[in-house]
A protein has these predicted regions:
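Hydrophobic helical membrane-anchoring modules
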Residues: 167-295
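Acceptor/aglycone-binding surface of glycosyltransferases and processive sugar-polymer synthases
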Residues: 52-58, 62-72, 91-166, 187-202, ...
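Non-catalytic, surface-exposed connector residues within folded enzymatic/regulatory domains
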Residues: 3, 20, 118-119, 141-144, ...
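Residue-level signature of catalytic and energy-coupling elements of molecular machines
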Residues: 9, 69, 86, 108, ...
Length: 295
């Protein structure tokens, strides 16, 4: 897939120069792959002066790889754009992004017009995620992934965020600089297979929610208080029935109630544990990544 990607992006570089008066170069981030990815990047870097690459010592995840690419690029760039190597996002949208950056915008988001290339399940889960984030007062852009262009000062401001639990879609929006939007049609995947399965998507969603909102903790508190209130009412009801000489029967309802309460407690502990785990990771302040090789 990478040779195909290189060809498409080489054409884009020429168009950026002629249509947006912008010189560009490519930086590929190899996120600890075990196939021929780094070999292809190295050969491309030797053959083309506008191509370079970094190979991370181990897999840092999608957000970590994006961070590494921006941090490695910002010192020698007036603007930095990020795009996945499968080029399902329309790379030509970067021409309009560059124009807006040249006109004074600091962050230009690539926004999908539709989600026709997705399965119904992915459309449903994505839309549910965006709606959930919006209900929690998160400022992420609807139908925007991580396809964007940022000015140097925006990237430098982003680099000041110290957290290791990265959710760039949320962090970038909080920078507050001048924004622009470019709308594009996302392509169906032409080559290769997705390496972002459902398990990773769910983990990413949970990470995004817990990185930018304490709403799950507030919800647990609300559920706990509600159950306490219901329990008090039931206790009063039981006492009154006992005084009247009536015994409340129903082992089935008792067992169901116990299982229900046990499930809520376990879930609450799990959600609380996620937040505690995030604190644990942040407190250690480990390095974000290590570069094993450069090309």
């Amino acid at each position: 897939m990478l040779p195909w990607t290189l060809g498409k992006l080489a054409t884009l570089i020429d168009r950026l120069k002629t249509e947006a008066s912008t010189d560009a170069r490519l930086l590929f981030v190899d996120d600890g792959s075990r196939d021929r990815t780094w070999e292809i990047i190295s050969e491309a870097a030797k053959a083309h002066c506008h191509v370079s690459g970094i190979r991370l010592s181990h897999n840092e995840g999608h957000q970590g790889a994006l961070w590494a690419g921006m941090q490695e690029s910002v010192a020698t760039s007036d603007a930095v754009a990020s795009i996945d190597a499968d080029l399902q996002d329309d790379e030509t949208a970067m021409i309009d992004m560059a124009r807006q950056i040249n006109d004074g915008k600091d962050i230009v988001y690539g926004v999908r017009k539709k989600r026709e290339t997705d399965t119904w399940f992915k459309r449903f889960t994505a839309q549910s995620f965006y709606k959930l984030m919006k209900s929690m007062d998160s400022e992420i852009v609807y139908n925007h992934a991580d396809f964007r262009m940022m000015s140097r000062r925006a990237v430098e401001a982003l680099m000041q965020y110290p957290e290791r639990n990265l959710f760039l879609r949320g962090i970038v929006r909080r920078l507050g600089f001048k924004e622009g939007f470019v709308y594009y049609d996302r392509r169906a995947r032409e080559l290769g297979e997705s390496k972002y399965p459902l398990k990773k998507m769910l983990a990413f969603s949970i990470d995004g929610i817990t990185s930018f909102s304490t709403a799950p903790l507030k919800f647990i508190t609300f559920v706990g208080l509600t159950m306490t209130l219901v329990s008090l009412v039931m206790i009063m009801f039981g006492i009154i029935r006992h005084i009247e000489g009536n015994t409340i029967e129903g082992w089935t309802s008792l067992l169901v109630s116990l299982w229900f309460i046990g499930g809520i407690i376990t879930t609450a502990m799990g959600v609380t544990g996620i937040y505690i785990g995030k604190i644990y990771v942040e407190v250690k302040q480990r390095p974000r990544y290590f570069v094993q090789e450069r090309a």
